[in-house]
Each structure stands twice: as structure tokens, then as C-alpha cells.
Amino acid sequence: MLAILLLQAAVPAVPTDWSALAPLPYLTAPQMAPPLARFVAGEIAAGRCSLPRPADGHYVVKVDVATLVGADGSVLRAVPHAIACPTVEQYSVGLVLKFARANLPPRAGAADQWFRATIVYDWGG
């Protein structure tokens, strides 16, 4: 029990003001290929997300993911901002983890730090 409490104390809490977080410092910027938006489009079409249909049919869905990065450049924790669509939130976390794998600079001697990753899904309905 004491070990669990010590671990919780060592992990920085998720910040409340995500707008103040620096962008996730990818070594190579990830590319959002059009097929990545298909899953999101399918979730909306199936009614599993309560996002309104744009008048012009062009969807732009943004998901912020607070990402805790260790000094070695590894992701320690990723927390999606709620957009009323849990499957898309978790899908976005998976993409951030994939994009960050071996793609973040080590920060020797630095403390664990929170960053913000923003995933943007863009497609015509």
C-alpha cells in the first residue's frame, strides 16, 4: 500500500489548464493520413458520438491529449480531453502513443513533463 502511495506522489497530476501545455516535441511531425479519419467518421455515422453534422458536411474533429513524457523521451501517461465520444478519445490516445514511439527527444536530467498533442480528423461527410 505504501508503495502505491509513493508512486502516486511521484507522478505529476494532470494539469487543469491544457492550453498552457507546450506542444508534444516530435522529432518528426506525424502525418495524419486520410484513412485515419475513417474510424472517426464511422463512429459518428453509427451514432456512437454526439457530434453535430456540419451544414456543409465537412467535419473537423480535434482531440487534445495531455501527454506525460519522461526524461528518456518515453510516454508515461496519456489522457484524452473529453469530446463526448469515448471510442474516438481512446483511438486518439493510441495514435499519440504510436506517433511518439521513438520519436521524442530525450531530455537528460529533466523531470517528467506534461505536453499537449492535438489530433485533427478532417474529412468531407
Where are these regions (language model features)?
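Charge-biased low-complexity segments
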Residues: 2-125
